[in-house]
């Protein structure tokens, strides 16, 4: 039986998703019996950067012209391309202030030396190529990566959460951070899958997994305003991880 060829790539980011994959440890060893990893520079010294791939996992945002060039090459050689991590899916932290001219950032940080930088506003992968599946998270949950690989090996799309973090809070019987503790919590509009980890430690959800489908952002903002949070604080929180999401962009235009 021919093993599916897999590639694991990183664009501009922290490599958090690749570390999560390595931390799968025992489970990863079991998976290696069923797949042929041909490209994974974080874990391997010998990598094939030309072979055709059955599945490519790509983390990181497109922040440089070289990122875009590499991404398009990966797409051309891959049957399936999976975006992993919030940077790849939404643009992540690097894209939080794309509304500000990049030249202004570069000048403030690097002075005149910033003029030589070739970086571009950070963008998610699907702004450049077709993405077959997105697994969000900062970083991703290793269980979701393992599930995705297992399902894809059987030719099926993995079943990922399609509900909000609030649902996981209720399942865990946590006190609501928004209503019960009056915290600036984005749980009602954030994609689940983390097990409501932050609320479990008495920390409000900061939206690191990006917005859930059909999130009612306007109602979330209205509730937060009524609780005394300033529009600036609310917008800064919303921009932190998924500022490029269309549903959030629509809200920013209203304010």
Positions of PLM-derived features:
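Iron-sulfur (Fe-S) cluster-binding modules
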Residues: 1-57, 62, 66-80, 103-255
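Short gly/pro/ser/thr-enriched loop/turn and capping motifs at secondary-structure boundaries
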Residues: 87-92
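Portal/gating segments that form or line small-molecule/metal binding sites
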Residues: 97
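Short beta-strand elements at the ligand-binding edges of bilobed clamshell
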Residues: 100
């Amino acid at each position: 039986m021919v093993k599916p060829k897999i590639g694991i790539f990183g664009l501009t980011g922290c490599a958090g998703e690749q570390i999560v994959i390595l931390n799968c440890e025992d489970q990863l060893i079991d998976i290696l019996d069923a797949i042929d990893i041909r490209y994974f520079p974080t874990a391997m010294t010998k990598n094939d950067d030309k072979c055709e791939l059955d599945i490519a996992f790509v983390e990181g945002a497109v922040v440089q012209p070289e990122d875009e060039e590499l991404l398009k090459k990966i797409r051309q050689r891959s049957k399936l391309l999976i975006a992993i991590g919030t940077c790849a899916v939404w643009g992540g932290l690097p894209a939080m202030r794309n509304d500000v001219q990049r030249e202004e950032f570069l000048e403030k940080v690097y002075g005149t030396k910033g003029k030589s930088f070739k970086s571009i506003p950070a963008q998610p992968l699907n702004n450049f190529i077709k993405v077959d599946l997105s697994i969000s998270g900062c970083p991703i949950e290793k269980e979701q990566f393992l599930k995705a690989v297992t399902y894809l090996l059987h030719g099926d799309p993995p079943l990922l959460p399609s509900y909000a973090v609030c649902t996981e809070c209720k399942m865990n019987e946590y006190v609501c951070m928004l209503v019960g503790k009056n915290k600036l919590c984005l749980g009602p509009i954030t994609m689940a899958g983390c097990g409501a980890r932050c609320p479990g430690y008495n920390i409000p959800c900061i939206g690191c997994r990006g917005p859930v489908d059909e999130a009612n952002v306007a109602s979330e903002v209205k509730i937060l305003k009524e609780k005394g949070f300033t529009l600036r604080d609310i917008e800064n929180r919303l921009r932190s991880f998924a500022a490029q999401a269309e549903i959030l962009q629509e809200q920013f235009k209203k304010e």
